[in-house]
Amino acid sequence: TSLWAKNSEMEANSKLWIKTNSVEDELLSDSSYDEMLLSNVKSAWMVEMWCDEENIRSIEKDLDVNPGDINYRVDIMAWLIHSSREIILADDVFSDEHMPQIAELIKQLDVLRLRVRHGCKEDLLTLVNIPNVGRYRARELSKLDIRTPHDVANMTKKKIDQILKIRGWGPQLLDKIMLEVAKVIEPSKQKQQKVRLDDIPLDDEI
């Protein structure tokens, strides 16, 4: 179900009209800029903004929608992407020589579905899967060069102190996140090199 374009968005030079014009070459429909076309573009634009980590308040304001609209369309889009993936896998019209391209397409669809589900860019996908880490917290971690669960498991005290200074973070929350990561990843242990006696130079060798 598409988001209906408002009367103001039907007018030439509205934000939605300009957006539709900018993606005209990507549209599968040849219809003129009627209400249905603008509504379809509006729905796709909303999901695009969501995946590009736009603030929810900004999406609501720019597109005149509410949180329910966003959640509903995001769920539908994720389902459509998954369905597309299954159709491609089940289709037997492709020959063996197309398998590398099919595999790449499936990979891209999987990434896109995860981006739609979590509302983030691709570089955050390894972080947003951690319980209690949504897209906002994941982006805050990435700004501190913490980009993977391994990075979380091996955070230094300095990194932890930096995180706790960020608004919305607290010791209890960070402990929960680190405990979740510790269930699947053990912090790498720094191996200290032992100095062997025969490695110590003699006086006449210095």
Q: Regions from the language model: what does each represent?
A:
Residues 88-100, 112, 116-126, 131, ...:
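Accessory alpha-helical DNA-binding modules that contact the DNA backbone or grooves
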